[in-house]
């Protein structure tokens, strides 16, 4: 399912533990790490897709998490040119995502990475709330910054100061109030 602009509808999941750290998964057979995410089926709402992807990629069920909130609209990112895909009638140039913030309320032993036929992750760990922005694959850094910026106030309400102070360059991305010359090199590409 690709929209008329070439973006595939998708959901992203920021899974937070009680101390404000977030789930960070290593992709199977790749050196890359990322948040759980995945495409929506044509008959799914974003919330339904989120719970399906959560289970497929982490083994967690709705009763293991609390849904804290979501980004208010779609956040987009473009794929690098070598990853752009075409089928008979449409070209997929990127993804548009609704990002969800969840808190793990069950025991972390419920995380099982082998729940689907083709697991997404082979290892996971907890990292600080802002860590993923500079450690995800380059072309996703802008969307990660925007998603975490939009979800940070919800996270702060739940865990207090444990999520840490938003780095200045993330504030600048989110508020768009400074020129790119003040930001890390990777930001100017997005």
Swiss-Prot record:
Position of sequence motif Nudix box: 38-59
PROSITE patterns the record matches: NUDIX (PS51462), NUDIX_BOX (PS00893)
Keywords for the protein's UniProt record, in alphabetical order: Hydrolase
Cofactor: a divalent metal cation
Positions of transmembrane segments: none
Nudix hydrolase domain ranges (all copies): 6-149
Keyword tRNA processing found: no
Catalytic activity, EC: 3.6.1.-
Single Gene Ontology MF annotation: pyrophosphatase activity
Cited PANTHER family: ADP-RIBOSE PYROPHOSPHATASE, DIHYDRONEOPTERIN TRIPHOSPHATE DIPHOSPHATASE
Job of this protein: Accelerates the degradation of transcripts by removing pyrophosphate from the 5'-end of triphosphorylated RNA, leading to a more labile monophosphorylated state that can stimulate subsequent ribonuclease cleavage.
Family, as annotated: Belongs to the Nudix hydrolase family. RppH subfamily.
Name of protein: RNA pyrophosphohydrolase
Gene that this sequence comes from: rppH
């Amino acid at each position: 399912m690709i929209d008329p602009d070439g973006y595939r509808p998708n959901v992203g999941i920021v899974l937070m533990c009680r101390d404000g750290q977030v789930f960070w998964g290593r992709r199977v057979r790749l050196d890359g790490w990322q948040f759980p995410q995945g495409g929506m089926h044509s008959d799914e709402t974003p919330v339904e897709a989120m719970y399906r992807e959560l289970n497929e990629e982490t083994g967690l069920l709705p009763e293991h998490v609390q849904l804290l909130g979501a980004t208010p609209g779609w956040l987009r990112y473009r794929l690098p040119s070598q990853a752009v895909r075409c089928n008979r009638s449409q070209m997929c140039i990127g993804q548009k995502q609704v990002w969800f913030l969840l808190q793990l309320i069950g025991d972390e032993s419920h995380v099982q990475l082998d729940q689907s036929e083709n697991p997404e992750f082979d290892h996971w760990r907890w990292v600080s709330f802002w860590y993923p922005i500079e450690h995800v694959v380059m072309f996703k850094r802008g969307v990660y910054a925007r998603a975490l910026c939009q979800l940070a106030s919800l996270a702060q309400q739940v865990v207090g100061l444990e999520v840490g102070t938003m780095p200045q360059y993330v504030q600048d991305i989110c508020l768009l109030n400074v020129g790119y010359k003040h930001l890390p090199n990777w930001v100017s590409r997005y």
